[in-house]
């Protein structure tokens, strides 16, 4: 039902007014045209950004631009936001996600808010009141029971994830 663009859809810098802009080579018609195309196919359009100053791949993050970015997403008719946790400079996770939640609400368009915090700050204790969906680990990797380090972060196999997070099943439910 959703087509979600992950990290790297935007230009390396914001425009002169501080707005996010699409990478003009990857998306020459921009995000609104892409959203219109996806919606015309009967699908919903999702986009990625990050609570930090930069995304995981080094593109502009939303820190300090939450309300401006939320207005952009609404003007592009975005239906879903995956909001990652890279380059967060010791931000308070719950507070950072509340700020974007409030910005999305203020933008006036219903946007599913997916909290991609990796479980480091125990989102199972607060995320259900902040977003529509939340993760509890880092990235899933194509293996059954393994962990692969990537420097400052790791990926896990599904069995390892199940065993790591089995004690939080009581807080799981539809949308979480």
Please report, for each region that a protein language model flagged, where it lies by residue.
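Glycan-recognition surfaces
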Residues: 65-68, 112-176
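Extracellular/periplasmic catalytic domains that process cell-envelope and extracellular macromolecules
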Residues: 38-40, 74-75, 105-108, 127-128
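Extracytoplasmic, non-cytosolic globular domains
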Residues: 80, 85-119
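Feature targets compositionally biased, intrinsically disordered low-complexity regions
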Residues: 17, 29, 45, 107, ...
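Generic recognition of stable, solvent-exposed alpha-helical segments in well-folded globular domains
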Residues: 29-33, 68, 91-95, 99, ...
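Generic structural hydrophobic/aromatic packing signal, biased to beta-strands
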Residues: 3, 45, 73, 100, ...
């Amino acid at each position: 039902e959703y087509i979600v663009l992950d990290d790297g859809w935007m230009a390396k810098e914001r425009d002169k007014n501080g707005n996010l802009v699409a990478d003009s080579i990857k998306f020459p018609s921009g995000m609104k045209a892409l959203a219109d195309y996806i919606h015309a196919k009967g699908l919903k359009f999702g986009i990625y950004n990050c609570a930090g100053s930069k995304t995981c791949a080094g593109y502009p993050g939303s820190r300090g631009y939450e309300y401006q970015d939320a207005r952009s997403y609404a003007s592009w008719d975005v239906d879903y936001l995956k909001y990652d946790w890279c380059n967060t400079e010791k931000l308070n996770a719950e507070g950072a996600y509340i700020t974007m939640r409030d910005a999305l609400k203020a933008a006036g368009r219903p946007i599913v808010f997916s909290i991609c915090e990796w479980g480091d700050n125990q989102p199972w204790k607060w995320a259900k009141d902040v977003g529509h969906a939340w993760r509890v680990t880092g990235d899933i990797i194509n293996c059954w029971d393994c962990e692969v380090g990537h420097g400052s972060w790791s990926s896990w196999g599904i069995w390892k994830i199940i065993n790591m997070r089995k004690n939080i099943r009581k807080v799981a439910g539809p949308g979480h």
